[in-house]
Amino acid sequence: MSDSEEDLGVQLKGLKIARHLKESGEHTDEESNSSPEHDCGLSNQDDLTVMHTQAKEEVFKRREEDGTRTEDALHEGEAGKEGTGFPSSQSVCSPNEADSGIDRADKPILLDPFKSVHDTDPVPGTKSRSNSDSDSDSDDGGWQEMPAVSSFNIYNHRGELELTSKVRNSEQASETSPTVPPGKNCKSVNDSRFDYTKMAAEQQAQRSYRTNKKTDFLFDHKVLKKKINSSQTSVNLTSSPSTTSLNNEKNNDDDDDDSYDEYEDDVEPVNDLNRDSQLNITKNLLSDMEKFAYVGAINILANQMCTNLATLCLCIDIKSHKKLAHRLQFTQKDMAAWKTVVLSRLYDHLGISQEEIVMIEKLSLHKIQLEDLCKCLKTTQSIDNPWENDRDHEEDGIEETTERMSPNEQNGSVQASTPDPEQSATPETPKAKQSPLSSDVPGKVLDPENVKSQDKLNIDVAWTIICDLFLICLQSSTYDSRSRTLLINFAKVLNMTSLEICEFERRVTDSLDMEQSTEDQVWDEQDHMRNRRRSKRRKKMAYVALAMVGGSLVLGLSGGLLAPVIGGGIAAGLSTIGITGATSFLTGVGGTTVVAVSSTAIGANIGARGMSKRMGSVRTFEFRPLHNNRRVNLILTVSGWMVGNEDDVRLPFSTVDPVEGDLYSLYWEPEMLKSIGQTVSIVATEIFTTSLQQILGATVLTALISSIQWPMALSKLGYILDNPWNVSLDRAWSAGKILADTLIARNLGARPITLVGFSIGARVIFSCLIELCKKKALGLIENVYLFGTPAVMKKEQLVMARSVVSGRFVNGYSDKDWFLAYLFRAAAGGFSAVMGISTIENVEGIENINCTEFVDGHLNYRKSMPKLLKRIGIAVLSEEFVEIEEMMNPEEVKRKRKLINDVDAAQKKLSERKKHNSWVPKWLKPKKSKWKVMVEEAVEEGRDMQDLPENDVNNNENENPDEHEGIARQKRRDAALVDHGALMHELQLIKQAMHEDEIKNKACLPGEDKEVESSNDFLGESHYKPPSTPKINPPQSPNNFQLLSAGRTILPEDDDFDPRGKKKVEFSFPDDI
């Protein structure tokens, strides 16, 4: 065997061809008996080697001359069989077949992989195959395109079938491969159902399919034009066989132009479809009546937006706020300018005359309703094709296209030529027999070249107008937030949801290559932070100096006035520990001076340090993207706190549906967010400090602590200035200004932005909106959603914030948010109304949503964010998110345990009662009442009883009952305040004495001596035993008091029953006494 036959490519090609021909064995056997191609003679192996080498050299020479690509001879042979069926010796018996020495009837033929298409004269009517094998077989010396193999169907985020399953079984492959026509894309193979998808759930794929089905008339497959050209090429091949090679070269050149590799090619081929061409298409699809209704509805909607802004400006007294009046006036002027620009573009696009413009502008004055104008826009119509060709060419084109396309493609691309009455009656309901997601989600905008062969076009007027308006809004290469609000409001009038608009925006931008550029985005705002820090430097120095003076005055005055008392307390404490002689100095003039000066210095230090920390600048300000798909809108989220070191600010918003747009999260001041999120440290610290002061009050320095509690209450300057809550509030306000600078600089793209935040994050957004109003930056913010905002309701600020938002402004509050009700008001809010705990009234355009059913407290906002987002209308994939498991720090656990042990020890020490623990005489101290002492002793005895395990008691009972009784008497005493057993014993003694007196009286009567004697003998003193004291069980109730169940019932004795006297039986109970 020669070296050429041992080449690896030849062996692999042979194996591939053998497997391919084996799959269609029956078809090969039938033609082997009837076709004359087996009559060709076969030569020896040497001839095969010579012919093989010569053919290979000719191919390489020809490739150097004209650069044409080779094609597998197998494809040509199969095309001859699938074509007209005429036998040809040139095409049937190649030199390689003649000299192979292998019987074709027994084994599959190994054709020459280097056989050129120009070496043989093709049979008229043959079809060229465009499978991936033909591309991979061409040996051009570079990287070969390898087909992707998968065991299941995979869909992309648009719902398109990206990769079909590769069936390795020969039987299944024989069933699927012959049904695929030449040139058909792999997206239509095995696409009759929804298979595995990379999207979050199958529901998303089905939703995308239903939404995209409504706009299929505006889009077409990317390969449709190629298929139509290939069908026209086959007609030319049938008529003129001599021009086959030229047509093949032309088709190959077209394939080269269509296939673009971003890693191999330097310049991307230019696509003729753009925004302007699509605008011309949509304009031609509308009638005059629909155009006037379209323009009139947009005019009315724009006037409504201007009216709402004017109503908002009238909510406040403009005369008393001149600066605010100027800002609101500029906002109204800018809104009017935007309206003029949008309407002028629309008039020019649709060709509206000046007289018609005047008529349309007066529609709002006549109180025309939108529902009346939009009735004609909610229909599906069948219109004449404006790009129709001649009738003869149309019929030929339809016939050839029908031959070359599968039934699924015919339904997807040619169904417009035969309008369906069911589809026209219910345009929004897709048919059950339509092809699924893979074949109905194309990626190319409708091209007139693709529909020239159609007589009628079925269009949905509403979606055509939405597409036209969307492209009009993007005409200046910027997407204003007011334009998107106008688009969504208009879609609601046409009975479309915002989610469908998001799907449509994504589809249009993907088709026209209009994605938002992300290369120029800035993720770290160092420049803006530096500028803000410089502008704030002088203000910070002034505030620090003021706080220093104020702190020195507060502590200096309080320390100077109370210096004698403080000095006396210090002297008393020192004398307690054995240091004497300091009383005269500390209570004199010298001590007073020392205390006053020290208090002044300490106050100045506390004030300066606290204000410096509070006026600090923002050090961390970054953006963390969660969904970055280059969409035309952005959702920016701001978290209120972080839980632990491993927490992520994107986690509460991680369940938002990606179709809503790009989603970024603001990562700012992580140390401060972690300190807030770990615990409610502010309230807990205040309570803990109070308990420590009480603990210290029972120690040696009792007099000192008690004497300086008043100046400490007056001098909580440090806590007021630099507590974590106040510092976080001021830092959030500063971060909002930096966010405003970022949005003004368009660092996140020239697109509408939706802001979502909770707790401190909502305060960041609120500060950003006010700063945008001050900077007169309009058209940036589309929607705002605030939850649990720690901000005071000031009407001026609310009006400023609402004026820069074009869409919805939602305030989420909770009635059970005690955190804001107590802490925020105590720290900064005073008695003013807070946004996070009450509704906002008397301000136009603000929605109030009560979140109490989802939020029990302030710390539940983070956990309930997916539910709240779903409540306000944002699509979410799940109502819960999975927390990040954080590893416990051993040092932190050890520190917490030590702190708990110290607190327990201090409380135990405080609870111990000492008889002589101070210099105050005992008779001067307040005394407790007797009943208080008794209750405390009973409680302590009950605790001692509870400390004894039950198992030990049972064991002691079994071993030695006497010892157990002694232990029980010592450790288990009755917790009741009254000894019921003693009372019962005294009662029995009284009854016995009364009984003896009665017997003596009876003995004095005559005739009854014998009976009395017999009774005395029977009831002698030696035989009489009073009832013993009942054993009292230990208390079982948790409060250790058993007044209701104490004692036992007293039953009558035997001698109480006198049959002669028939005395009445009486029962006595201890509780009745």
Swiss-Prot record:
Single annotated GO MF: AP-1 adaptor complex binding
Secretion signal, residue range per the UniProt entry: none
Keyword line: Cytoplasmic vesicle, Endosome, Glycoprotein, Golgi apparatus, Hydrolase, Membrane, Phosphoprotein, Transmembrane, Transmembrane helix
Biased composition (Acidic residues): 252-267
Annotated transmembrane regions: 292-312, 457-477, 553-573, 577-597, 818-838
Enzyme class: hydrolase
Chain ranges for the short sequence motif APM2-interacting WQEMP motif as given in the UniProt record: 143-147
Membrane topology value: Multi-pass membrane protein
Top-rank lineage group of the source organism: Eukaryota
Compositionally skewed regions (Basic and acidic residues) per UniProt: 54-81, 101-121
Subunit-level organization: Interacts with RPP0. Interacts with APM2.
Additional note from the record: Present with 1110 molecules/cell in log phase SD medium.
Family note: Belongs to the TMCO4 family.
Name of the protein this chain belongs to: Probable lipase MIL1
Organism name: Saccharomyces cerevisiae (strain ATCC 204508 / S288c)
Organism placement in taxonomy: Eukaryota, Fungi, Dikarya, Ascomycota, Saccharomycotina
Name of the gene: MIL1
